[in-house]
From Swiss-Prot:
UniProt lineage: Bacteria, Bacillati, Bacillota, Bacilli, Bacillales
TM ranges: none
SUPFAM superfamilies: HPr-like
Family named by the database record: Belongs to the HPr family.
Protein name: Phosphocarrier protein HPr
InterPro entries (UniProt xref): HPr (IPR050399), HPr-like (IPR000032), HPr-like_sf (IPR035895), PTS_HPr_His_P_site (IPR001020), PTS_HPr_Ser_P_site (IPR002114)
Activity: how regulated: Phosphorylation on Ser-46 inhibits the phosphoryl transfer from enzyme I to HPr.
Length: 88
C-alpha cells in the first residue's frame, strides 16, 4: 500500500471539475484508491463519495492506493492535483 498526503491550496477546495478529473484518473487504475479527509475515507473512483467530503481550502487529505499499480496511481493523482491547482 502506498499513501501520500497533500494540503489543498485552491480557494474553492475540491469542487466539481477537479473532483471529476480525480475520479477519472483513479478509475484508470486497478488498485483500490481511497481519499481520506477528517477521518473519513471514500472511494476515489466515486464522484459522489469525493464530493460528499466537502474538502475546502487548507484541508489536509491523504490518498491511499493498494494494488498492482499503486505507485503509478499515486503519481498520476499527484499530477492531477498539481495541474488542477489544488496543491503546490
Amino acid at each position: 500500500m502506498e499513501q501520500k498526503s497533500y494540503v489543498i491550496i485552491d480557494e474553492t477546495g475540491i469542487h466539481a471539475r477537479p473532483a471529476t478529473m480525480l475520479v477519472q484518473t483513479a478509475s484508470k487504475f486497478d488498485s483500490d484508491i481511497q481519499l481520506e479527509y477528517n477521518g473519513k475515507k471514500v472511494n476515489l473512483k466515486s464522484i459522489m463519495g469525493v464530493m460528499s467530503l466537502g474538502v475546502g481550502k487548507d484541508a489536509e487529505i491523504t490518498i491511499y492506493a493498494d494494488g498492482s499499480d499503486e505507485t503509478d496511481a499515486i503519481e498520476a493523482i499527484t499530477d492531477i492535483l498539481s495541474k488542477e491547482g489544488l496543491t503546490k
